[in-house]
Amino acid sequence: MTQEELDALMNGGDLENLEALETKEETKEEAKEEAKEEAKEEAKEKEEIKEESSSQKMTVKKEDAEKYGKISPNEWPPPPPTEEHKVVHQLDDVTRDSEVKATQIFDQLDLIGASAEKIAKMVKKIQEPLQKHQEIFDNLHGHFPHVESFKTALNEQQEILNALKSIEEEAANCSDSSMQAMDIMQFQDIHRQKIERVVNVMRALSQYMNSLFEGKIDDSKRVSSATFITGDDDKDLASADDIEALIASFGAK
């Protein structure tokens, strides 16, 4: 009987009031128990979610580790420092290969520009005699306007000169485009310089970290690390109780 029930009886309360108080008290207890159960379930769910997320981040597939393939950024540890995963090596390869390919592209653009200039010179050589022929046919057509062959030859000569002029213009456009392409290719040299700057910063940072963690004792003379320290959680090791039980079993035999 609670203090409230005792006070009710002392004040002359009847049994109905007493039962009402008991019912109210039981309801409070049940509400408290339900709240505790809900809090426990929520805490358990949060713990499970945390364990799942941590296990996903710390998982590495065995086949990925064996073949040193691509590893997801959410997995740990990162790829081993093999030749294909060394960052500075890859950046050096990029700068070297891009410089070689850029040189080849410049050579091809230079060849295109030189060929366009040759075409323009050849067109000029052809135009000179054709212009003289046009003057001749023009005089003939002026003196003999009724001769149809002179008129036809004059028109054909004019069409040839117009075609040569178009070829000369296209050759000039080709030469200008090759020069513009060479100017645009200057971005490759700028990118190479940026990559080299990044490589130099990374190398300086690597040397700084090596100097920062450098020790006075040589690695060959340094004491090896303990495989197990008291307090570590390792199921493969026997505890003190297991050892005592084993000794006791030998004594019993």
From Swiss-Prot:
Main location: cytoplasm
GO cellular component: cytoplasm
MF annotations from Gene Ontology: phosphatase activity
Compositionally biased tracts (Basic and acidic residues): 21-69
Source domain of life: Bacteria
Region Disordered: start-end pairs: 1-84
EC number: 3.1.3.-
Subcellular location, record wording: Cytoplasm
Annotated SUPFAM superfamilies: Chemotaxis phosphatase CheZ
Keywords: Cytoplasm, Hydrolase
InterPro entries on file: CheZ_Pase (IPR047802)
Complexes and interactors: Interacts with ChePep; this interaction is essential for each other polar localization.
Job of this protein: Plays an important role in bacterial chemotaxis signal transduction pathway by accelerating the dephosphorylation of phosphorylated CheY (CheY-P). Also dephosphorylates CheV2 but not CheV1 or CheV3. In addition, forms a distinct chemotaxis regulatory complex with ChePep independently of the core chemotaxis signaling proteins.
Annotated family: Belongs to the CheZ family.
Official protein name in the record: Protein phosphatase CheZ
UniProt source species: Helicobacter pylori (strain ATCC 700392 / 26695)
